[in-house]
C-alpha cells in the first residue's frame, strides 16, 4: 500500500541524511525492523490524524550530529531525481493517470491521447500508433494503467511539499546549523521532527546504493525507473573492437583476430561503438562497468602504451563523424568522460577538464540523458554522486546514442543490465 511505502521511504531518507555516522548509524537505523514498531489504523488504512505512525527504537541510540541548513540538495540530489522519475516526457509535468506502453515507457493518459489523436470510428482501419520515445509500434489496446508509477508520483509530491514547508528553514542555531539526533524520535514528540533529516539537506550521502534496505525495493526501483535496456550495435564498431555474443560488452580485439569488413556506419579511426538504441525524446539512463579501463583521446586507434588502459563512456549524436578524426567534445556531437592515468576527465573543449576528487575513477559510471533539457550528466553508479554534467542551451535536436570507446584488450566495457 502507498502509505506503507511512504513510511519506509521516510525511514530510508532519514538514514541517508546522517553525515559522518558511518556504518554504525546505518546499522542503528536499519535495525528498526527488529526493535521498532509502527502504529496505524486497525483496518489497515493509512495512518489517521489520531493514529500517526510512530517509531520506537532501542535505548542508547541517541548519538547527536549537526546538519547544515544551507546545503542545496538532499544527498546527491535525491529529491530532484525522484521528481524527474515522476515527470511525463511529453508535457514535462508530473504524471497524471500514467499509462504503460508495451515498450515499457510511461506517459500521462491525456498526453498520449493528444499525441495519437482521436481513435478511429468502429469498423474503420486504425491508424498505426507508436511510442513517442523509442518509436516502437504500440497498439492502443496495449495501454494499461501504471499503478506503481502513480504511487511513486504521490511519494515525490509529498516529499516536495514537506521540503517546501516554512519550518524546513526555521530554527537556525549556531550560524545556520541545528542539532538533530542520530536515531529516530521517541514516541509522543511532534511528528514534524521525523521529517527533519530530509528537511535539512546534506551535501553528500555516506551510504552506497547497495546499502539500501533489502526489504524496500521501491527506492531502487525509483532510482532506476529510467534505466534503458541497452545492447551494442556491431555495425558501428571499429574493426579492431570485439563485441560479446550478448552485445553487452566490448574490448579491443587481441592481435591476429579477423576483422569484419568496413561499412559506412563504422568508426574507422576512433576505437568506438554506439548503442543499438537511440533516443529522440525523454529521459534515459544507463550504467557502464569500466573495470580497470578508461577513453582514448588518441583517435588513431593505436595503443598509446602497453601499461596503461583507456576508456570513454557517454553519448553521441546520430551526426557524429564516423570516418577520420573525431572531435571528442560537445561541438563534435560527443558528450563523454574519459578515464586515463587513474583519473577521470570530462571531454570538454578546447581541453579536457580534470574532475578533482574522483581518484580512482568509479568502476560503474551512470549516464543520465535528458533530451528536452539538453543535459547529459554522469554519476558514480554506486553512490549516485554527480561527477559532471554537460548542459546545452536547449533540446539536443537529434537522436542520441550511447557511446563506448576502449583501447584495452584486457579490460572490457560492460553494459550493466537494467535489472541489476
Curated annotation (Swiss-Prot):
Residues 246-265 are annotated as: Disordered. InterPro entries: B30.2/SPRY, B30.2/SPRY_sf, Butyrophylin_SPRY, ConA-like_dom_sf, PRY, SPRY_dom, TRIM/RBCC, Znf-RING_euk. It is an enzyme of class 2 (transferase). One of its GO terms (cellular component) is cytoplasm. It is found in: Cytoplasm. Its EC number is 2.3.2.27. A zinc finger (RING-type) spans 88-135. It catalyses: S-ubiquitinyl-[E2 ubiquitin-conjugating enzyme]-L-cysteine + [acceptor protein]-L-lysine = [E2 ubiquitin-conjugating enzyme]-L-cysteine + N(6)-ubiquitinyl-[acceptor protein]-L-lysine. Keywords: Cytoplasm, Metal-binding, Transferase, Zinc, Zinc-finger. Residues 210-420 form the B30.2/SPRY domain. Plays an inhibitory role in anti-RNA viral innate immunity by targeting the adapter DDX3X and promoting its 'Lys-48'-linked polyubiquitination. Alternatively, enhances the cGAS-STING pathway activation by promoting 'Lys-63'-linked ubiquitination of STING1, facilitating the STING1-TBK1 complex formation and STING1 activation. One of its GO terms (biological process) is innate immune response. It comes from the Eukaryota. The lineage of its organism: Eukaryota, Metazoa, Chordata, Craniata, Vertebrata. GO terms for molecular function: ubiquitin protein ligase activity; zinc ion binding. Pfam families: PRY, SPRY, zf-RING_UBOX. This is RING finger protein 39. PROSITE patterns: B302_SPRY (PS50188), ZF_RING_1 (PS00518), ZF_RING_2 (PS50089). Pathway: Protein modification; protein ubiquitination.
